[in-house]
Amino acid sequence: MLKNNHTKKLYEKIEKDTEGYLKKAADWSIELAKEIAKKEKIVLTNDHWTVINFIRKFYFKFNITPSMRMLIKSIEKKIGLKKSNSIYLFRLFPEGPAKQASKIAGIPKPSRCL
């Protein structure tokens, strides 16, 4: 419980934009991601983490979030063809795979998201 309170307080203190995206990707941690997911009403599974980790790696390599097409192609390679479609990704991240996963991954809101 103490760790949860600490993470919650940390989340409150960290600088975010008006929509809750971290302003500094360096502030991100796994515990913080879990707290953000909780606020987004998402229980993280291995499939969520596959998407989150891919988005973080892509962002730090190219300094931009991946397009939906890139995300689907990567997920196809990582977790299989049946799960590599936009319908499945929307089940994981109902508010939008790129948008919601980016928020949980601690990177800026994708410029392609409204």
Curated annotation (Swiss-Prot):
It is found in: Cytoplasm. InterPro entries: DsrC-like_C, DsrC-like_dom_sf, DsrC-like_N, DsrC/TusE. GO terms for molecular function: sulfur carrier activity; transferase activity. Transmembrane segments: none annotated. It comes from the Bacteria. Its EC number is 2.8.1.-. The active site is at C113. GO terms for cellular component: cytoplasm. Its main location: cytoplasm. Keywords: Cytoplasm, Transferase, tRNA processing. It holds the Pfam family DsrC. One of its GO terms (biological process) is tRNA wobble position uridine thiolation. Belongs to the DsrC/TusE family. Part of a sulfur-relay system required for 2-thiolation of 5-methylaminomethyl-2-thiouridine (mnm(5)s(2)U) at tRNA wobble positions. Could accept sulfur from TusD. Interacts with the TusBCD complex. Interacts with MnmA. This is Sulfurtransferase TusE. It comes from Buchnera aphidicola subsp. Schizaphis graminum (strain Sg).
